[in-house]
Each structure stands twice: as C-alpha cells, then as structure tokens.
Regions:
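GHKL/Bergerat-fold ATPase module in large chromosome/replication-associated machines
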Residues: 105-172
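GHKL-type ATPase core
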Residues: 2-128
Length: 172
C-alpha cells in the first residue's frame, strides 16, 4: 500500500501515480503540496504538464497528507464543468475504503466544499448504504483478516429490500 516504502493506504483508485500524471497533462497548471512524515511540507508546481521548478520544502508540519490543486486546460477542453455528485460519490467511497483517511473536495468556482472521513471502514460504508433501509439485524457482520501481504475485509447487513446491493473492491 502506498508509495515510498509501503505502510500507507491499502486501497487506491487513481489518486496517485498515473491518475495524477493524466490530470497534470490535461491541466493549465497543477500544484502538489505534500505533508510528509519527516516533518516537512514539500511543494511543486506544474504548467501544462511540465515542472516549473524542482520540488522545494515550504514549511514544517506535524501532519501527513497530499493536497492537489489544478485548473483544466482550456486549450484542451471546450468546457470545464465537473459533475459534483460523481466526484463526491467516488471520493466518499475512497474515504470509506481507507479508514481514517480525510478527503476534501473543493469546487472553487461554485464555492462548494465537502469533507469525507470515516474511521469505521467497510462497516461504516454498509451502515451508510443501509441508513434509509429496514435492517433485518442491527449488528453489521464483519470480517477483517490479514494473512501475509493479503488483506480481506468483508461487511454484511441484510435488509428487507427487494434489490440486493453487492459491492466488491480490490487493490493491487
């Protein structure tokens, strides 16, 4: 999980790696600020896919996390309207799948902001999915098992709905 020697998150979905590379290539500008566990804050700015300057230390921190800010390139896109609900849905899922991870979605144009953080992992996700349903049992059945490098997490709660909802997530 994670880059920089592991020990990070166990599920990712295009937030780093090729995902940010593609966003960078399609942006007029992109800025990345990383609060790293060495106590430093690193920063780098890109314009149209190219680094403007080398990575630099811009401060000290006692937090960890990454902030990525970008502006889609109007030379590539005719319109740059984002579907808030689509982004919110996926980022909420990622926050559930990465228990304790805080994800903030900000739309500067619409002056809109949402924050997602769930400490309960899949159990919290199942509770969220069933919040407006009649559960057949109150306690969510859950299994969380790690064998070597392989981790499996399962959460189940039956309800009286006629339609079943089965979600499966896998990482590398």
């Amino acid at each position: 999980g994670g880059k920089f020697g592991g020990g990070g998150y166990s599920v990712s979905g295009g937030l780093h790696g090729v995902g940010v590379s593609v966003v960078n290539a399609l942006s007029e500008w992109l800025e990345v600020e990383v609060h790293w566990n060495d106590g430093k804050v690193y920063f780098q700015r890109y314009e149209r896919g190219r680094a403007v300057e080398p990575v630099k230390v811009i401060g000290k921190t006692n937090k960890t996390g990454t902030k990525t800010t970008f502006k889609p390139d109007p030379q590539i896109f005719e319109t740059t309207e984002f579907e808030w609900e689509t982004l919110a849905h996926r980022l909420r899922e990622l926050a559930f799948l990465n228990s304790g991870l805080r994800i903030t979605l900000t739309d500067v144009k619409a002056d809109k902001k949402a924050e997602y953080k769930y400490d309960g992992g899949l159990v919290a996700f199942v509770a969220h999915l069933n919040k407006n349903k009649n559960e057949l049992h109150k306690e969510i059945i859950s299994i969380n098992k790690q064998v070597g490098d392989v981790g499996v997490e399962v959460a189940i709660q039956y309800n009286d709905s006629y339609v079943e909802s089965v979600f499966a997530f896998a990482n590398d």
